[in-house]
Structure formats: structure tokens, C-alpha cells
Amino acid sequence: MAKKLYIETHGCQMNEYDSSRMVDLLGEHQALEVTARAEDADVILLNTCSIRERAQDRVYSQLGRWRELKLANPDMVIAVGGCVASQEGAAIRDRAPYVDVVFGPQTLHRLPEMIDAARISKLPQVDVSFPEIEKFDHLPEPRIDGPSAYVSVMEGCSKYCTFCVVPYTRGEEVSRPFDDVIAEIIHLAENGVREVTLLGQNVNGYRGLTHDGRLADLAELIRVVAAVDGIDRIRYTTSHPLEFSDSLIQAHAEVPELVKHLHLPVQSGSDRILAAMKRNHTALEYKSKLRKLRAAVPGICISSDFIVGFPGETEKDFEQTMKLIADVGFDFSYSFVYSQRPGTPAADLADDTPEELKKERLNALQHRLNQQGFEISRQMVGSVQRILVTDYSKKDPGELQGRTENNRIVNFRCDNPTLIGQFADVHIDAAQPHSLRGSLIQ
């Protein structure tokens, strides 16, 4: 009987991508098959996130729940990867001594041998080092799971924002070779993928070495990806405003496969807070780049990230953030209350905003963003949108769902499952808080 793998993923799209590659790797090297039940597993993997305090707490809560499974089945291997593993290393075993393997984002390619070593030696295996992009040389071809796919083009970040753990948990920026990225995307396209999302912690800082020794930027990569037969849509995330270049704006204007949506995290609308965060740009500089983009691509939708309650944030600082939200017209954001992350420069600052006030500000910010996003959705009612049909609707098996160019989910009634993986024209009938309803145009 085949051995079983249970995997749980916390955090960002990069973690989702890494988890999919772990499944590929362990399927090829150890013939492990994925199970939906941890109690049935021979190997349990937890791919962790350390961006937020609660995400880190979740790790130890989850490991605590698996302790009984390990006691019942001592041969079970429990492995912890991702950014919490990178940050804490062997110290994870101080709180969860039944963990067998601890590995970082850059050493996931060593997972099969680490699992084997743990089984044979009965000793814990820990490797949270930062070998430069080596993991991609050891991974099998990616498994295809639907018409959309993530492709990691770079790892790490060298910006060292004062609130962020990424440079310490994933290392500094390292770009994958240009031809390696294109080869992976060709493989995906040959197997039915129609949309790719290019991933990196600072993806628009991509500088990939080409076969002739040049460094290609993200704009050049996008143009070549768009020329791959079968690829009809391109997205990328996550970007830093400093790296949002004129060449990228030109690519948005000239490459029809590049969607009319940009996720460009700003974190705050206050220049004082932006300086304290070491973002190295002002709110005006951020808005100026978006004005150029919108002049080149009218109608493009912009989403962002915000941190509320950063140390020293005053009411005036928060009002400036709310003004930026209104000025730009963001339609969505990943927004969080600030929490101290150990080892970051901001952790040395006084976290002096009361938690209740942080929550009030976060609620006000999210309410404003929800209003703006719904208004954009409402304006789409009556239009015809070309959507990539990705799956059955999560709420009604008699419906299919897909995404618009500007990243909105559309649900529509359809009894033809062969549309999944294809593009379809859908008339938008109604706007809902977090999705659209439509009718298939036959």
C-alpha cells in the first residue's frame, strides 16, 4: 500500500508554490501520495509563515495537535519547513521535541534525504541554510493542477524594511536564470496551463542571467513569457514600488497578455511612517508611478498591502493613509495590524499604539477599501468579461467560476465542465461583496 503525505501550508503564494514542489519531490523520490487526513499520513509536512505573530503561534498550536498522532505512530515523520523553520531552526524542537525534520525555504530540495536520515538514524535533521537558488536544480518538473500556475522566478529580498523578516528567513534576492524560468513555463503551457503568476518576494527586482551573459529584467521576462504558445494571461506578485520601472509600465501598455491588475504594496500613506519602515519612497512618489501607469493603461485596477499601528503612528499618519487610499482608488488590500517580529529593527521600537485603537483603524481602513472595491465591481455590471474558467463554484456545484483580468471571481450557471481550463465570455449580471455573478454568452 502506498505511503501517505499530509501537507498543511500557511502564508503567501510563495509558500503555496513551495508546497506544490514538495509534493512533486516526495512523489517522485518516495512515491508518497497526498492524503487529506493527517491521521492517515506516514509523513506530515507543515510549511510555515512568520510574517505575522498569529501565523507563528499557529505553528505551535498545530504541532501540539499532532503530538498525539506521533505518540500513536512513532514511525510517522513530522517535518516543519518555511519561514518559521528558517527563523527558529533547531529551537523548534525545544517546544515540539517530536518534530523529526526542520528545513528552510532554500533547502526543501533536501527533504527526501532528510526524511530518510531521520528514519534510519532516529535523530533530528535540521538544515535552514541559504544555498543560492540551488533547490531549483534538484526539483522535478512541476505537477499540473488546473489552468493557472505559479512560477517562482526569484527568492529572498534585499530591501530590509524595518518590519519584515523575509531577508532573514529567505535570504537576499537571488534570481533564477532566465532560460530556466522560460523552460518551466513552456512545460506548463504544453500541459494545459493558460495563465501563469510570476512569483518573488520582490518580483519586479528580477534580474535573470540569460544564455548570452546579460541580465534580463522582469519586463523582458514578461515579453518572452507572452510569446510562449498557449500562455494567454500573465500576472506577477509581489512588487516593491522602488523597482516599479518605466520598462514595466511600457510592458503593461504593450503586452496584451499582462492583466489589467497590479498588486503594489505601499504599507502606509504617511511619509514619516514610510521613512521609519525604510521603504525609501514617499507617498507622492508612489502616486506618481501609478499616474504614469494609468496614463498608459486606463482602467487598470490597483491593490496593495497596509500595516496599521506601526510604532509611532499618530492619528494624522493614519489619516494620510486613508487619504492615499481615496486618492489612488485601491480596490483591495491585504491589511494587518502591526505585530513585532523578533530580529527586525522595528522590534526595538516602542509598540505604543493601543491594540484597540489599532483594530479600530484597521476596521475603518478595510471598510473604505470594501466600499471602493464594491463600487468598481458595480461599475462592471452590464459589461461582458473574458474570464478564465478555473473550477466549479465553491458554493454551488451547478455553477462554474473563473477570474476576470482585474482579478475578480465570477460565478455563473453552466452544465458544461469541459469549459474548465478555457476562456469564456460572461455577461456580468450583479456585483456582490467579494465576487460577481454572470451569465455565459453562448
Swiss-Prot record:
TRAM domain mapped to chain residues: 378-442
One matching Pfam family: Radical_SAM
GO molecular function, one term: N6-isopentenyladenosine methylthiotransferase activity
Similarity remark: Belongs to the methylthiotransferase family. MiaB subfamily.
Keywords: 4Fe-4S, Cytoplasm, Iron, Iron-sulfur, Metal-binding, S-adenosyl-L-methionine, Transferase, tRNA processing
Cofactor list: [4Fe-4S] cluster
GO-annotated cellular components: cytosol
This protein's name: tRNA-2-methylthio-N(6)-dimethylallyladenosine synthase
Keyword hit for Iron: yes
Record-listed E.C. numbers: 2.8.4.3
Top EC class for this record: transferase
Function: Catalyzes the methylthiolation of N6-(dimethylallyl)adenosine (i(6)A), leading to the formation of 2-methylthio-N6-(dimethylallyl)adenosine (ms(2)i(6)A) at position 37 in tRNAs that read codons beginning with uridine.
Residues reported in the UniProt entry to bind [4Fe-4S] cluster 2: 157, 161, 164
Residues annotated to bind [4Fe-4S] cluster 1: 12, 49, 83
Subcellular location: Cytoplasm
Keyword hit for Metal-binding: yes
Subunit description: Monomer.
Domain of life according to the entry: Bacteria
Stored InterPro entries: Elp3/MiaA/NifB-like_rSAM, Methylthiotransferase, Methylthiotransferase_CS, Methylthiotransferase_N, Methylthiotransferase_N_sf, MiaB_methiolase, rSAM, rSAM_horseshoe
Domain Radical SAM core: from-to ranges: 143-375
